[in-house]
């Protein structure tokens, strides 16, 4: 055991002595340098002979200040902190470099299409018209509340059309189409009002409004305006042709009159002669009449011949409101 102790003491002393020698050698080198001594720069060019002579001197004179292996190891151990610091610096630089971002990459491929959506609501013409009316009403109310409408103006106000006139097709409020239900005999020199009509059973006929009275054959206007009326009256005059010779003044008149006053009010009138070779002929009358609320129109047949005539069933009477 004592031998080991003495061995450790000897090793420690040797280390201390070597350190002292190294320090002494460094001091001697510092003292041996002359501050006024001139040294040539390292890159001064020499001749070949001078270079060989200098290299021989360097090889012959060993440098007393060259450290041994132990001194080199101590110097390396003393610089371990510098290595750690350099690693820290490198780590800091790496972090800074990692903070930089490159340009964005190209867009990826398009994904698959999604599922189809729910079917939209069916929008009809009536719904669109109702929405437009509501929007127009709200805009008018906002303008009235904001006071943008001037109180006095010298110009005439613009004509404001109703919303129904803005639509491409106008609804027919008043109109009818009816036919005579049975035959009507008109005696000679007699004016008769046609009555007892009926609606056609076939598709295509129409009746709008409540102004038509089928029993009396009269149409009463519930809206003032201009109406268009037409009538197709089928007349059978076979009895006249068989009994007597026709006279030039023998004719038949078909009229559409207002309030049954064909001479006081404007009426629609057609005069047809009885010289036709056919047994039945048709008299057609058509035109426009202006009616006020409560006024009615009807068909009259005036027979000026010397024998009775017969108005056939199926004769038409039609009318429609054209405008106010």
Curated annotation (Swiss-Prot):
Signal peptide: 1-24
Glycosylation sites: 43
Positions with biased composition (Basic and acidic residues): 50-60
Positions with biased composition (Pro residues): 103-118
Keywords (A to Z) from UniProt: Disulfide bond, Glycoprotein, Hormone, Secreted, Signal
Basic residues: bias regions: 86-98
First-listed, main subcellular location of the protein, grouped into a coarse class: secreted
Molecular functions per Gene Ontology: hormone activity
Compartment(s): Secreted
Function (record text): Insulin-sensitizing adipocyte-secreted protein (adipokine) that regulates glucose metabolism in liver and adipose tissue.
Assembly and binders: Homomultimer; disulfide-linked.
PANTHER family: ADIPOLIN
Record-stated family: Belongs to the adipolin/erythroferrone family.
Entry protein name: Adipolin
UniProt source species: Xenopus tropicalis
Lineage: Eukaryota, Metazoa, Chordata, Craniata, Vertebrata
């Amino acid at each position: 055991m004592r031998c080991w102790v003495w061995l450790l003491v000897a090793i420690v002393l040797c280390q201390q002595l070597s350190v002292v020698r190294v320090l002494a050698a460094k001091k001697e080198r510092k003292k041996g340098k002359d501050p006024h001594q001139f040294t040539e720069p390292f890159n001064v060019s020499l001749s070949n002979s001078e270079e060989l002579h200098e290299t021989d001197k360097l090889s012959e004179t060993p440098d007393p200040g060259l450290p041994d292996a132990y001194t080199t190891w101590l110097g390396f151990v003393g610089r371990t902190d510098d290595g750690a610091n350099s690693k820290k610096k490198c780590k800091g630089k790496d972090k800074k470099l990692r903070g930089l971002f490159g340009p964005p990459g190209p867009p990826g491929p398009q994904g698959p299409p999604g599922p189809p959506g729910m079917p939209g609501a069916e929008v009809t013409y009536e719904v669109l018209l109702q929405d437009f009316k509501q929007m127009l009403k709200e805009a008018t109310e906002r303008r009235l509340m904001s006071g943008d409408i001037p109180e006095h103006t010298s110009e005439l106000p613009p004509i404001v059309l109703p919303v129904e006139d803005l639509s491409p097709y106008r609804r027919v409020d008043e109109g009818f189409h009816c036919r005579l239900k049975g035959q009507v005999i008109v005696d000679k020199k007699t004016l008769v009002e046609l009555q007892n009509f009926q609606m056609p059973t076939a598709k295509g006929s129409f009746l709008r409004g409540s102004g038509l009275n089928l029993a009396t054959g009269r149409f009463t206007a519930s809206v003032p305006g201009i109406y268009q009326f037409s009538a197709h009256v089928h007349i059978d005059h076979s009895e006249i042709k068989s009994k007597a010779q026709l006279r030039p003044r023998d004719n038949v008149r078909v009229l559409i009159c207002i309030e049954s006053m064909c001479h006081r009010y404007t009426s629609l009138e057609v005069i047809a002669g009885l010289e036709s070779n056919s047994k039945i002929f048709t008299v057609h009358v058509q035109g426009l009449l202006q009616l006020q609320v409560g006024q009615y129109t009807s068909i009259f047949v005036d027979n000026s011949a010397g024998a009775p005539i017969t108005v056939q069933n199926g004769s038409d009477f039609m009318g429609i409101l054209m405008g106010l």
